[in-house]
From Swiss-Prot:
Keyword Metal-binding: no
The entry's keywords: Amino-acid biosynthesis, Branched-chain amino acid biosynthesis, Leucine biosynthesis, Lyase
Gene Ontology MF term list: 3-isopropylmalate dehydratase activity
Species annotation: Methanothermobacter thermautotrophicus (strain ATCC 29096 / DSM 1053 / JCM 10044 / NBRC 100330 / Delta H) (Methanobacterium thermoautotrophicum)
Transmembrane spans: none
Chemical reaction(s) catalysed: (2R,3S)-3-isopropylmalate = (2S)-2-isopropylmalate
Top-tier EC class: lyase
Name of the protein in its database record: 3-isopropylmalate dehydratase small subunit
């Protein structure tokens, strides 16, 4: 995965990722139009498919809503790389097919606009000649992500009758 870095602070909550007034929407493409607008109203028009969000601690805190990772998916975010994540957001994002990569100290190493590559197999973020490690995902989570999320994963395994 290769793309541009968009940087955000600590404690970005789900209401910032997608404001509550848009919870009537379920379509990721519609949610995309409002993703992160609380911090950067122009973000939806600037972000490109394959870009990365790099954030501080506790990304995805606040309300437990699937709309937040769906909005990121609709925006084409390749992965969110953060110092740490809120636990429920972490599972919701994996379930909809968004990789979340925990990389302590990453906000000191990457800048907005950096072009990076993420190597999930090696567990590294690459910027030019520099490599920064992240906590590798468990194999079962990688499988879920490779299938596009939990429901496609279960359908392919034959464990989902829906």
């Amino acid at each position: 995965m290769k793309g541009k870095v968009w940087k955000f602070p600590d404690d970005v909550d789900t209401d910032i990722i997608i404001p509550g007034r848009y919870l009537v929407m379920r379509d990721p493409e519609k949610l995309r139009e409002h993703v992160m607008e609380g911090l950067d109203p122009e973000f939806p028009s600037k972000v490109k498919p394959g870009d990365f969000i790099v954030a501080g601690k506790n990304f995805g805190c606040g309300s437990s809503r699937e709309h937040a990772p769906l909005a990121l998916k609709g925006a084409g975010i390749a992965a969110v790389i953060a110092e740490s994540f809120a636990r429920i957001f972490y599972r919701n994002a994996i379930n909809v097919g968004i990789p979340l990569l925990e990389a302590p100290g990453i906000t000191e190493k990457l800048n907005e606009g950096d072009e990076i590559e993420v190597d999930l197999d090696r567990g590294v973020i690459i910027r030019g000649d520099d490599e920064f490690p992240f906590k590798k995902l468990p194999d079962f989570m990688v499988e879920i992500l490779e299938k596009g999320g939990l429901i496609p994963y279960l359908k392919k395994k034959g464990d989902f009758k829906g």
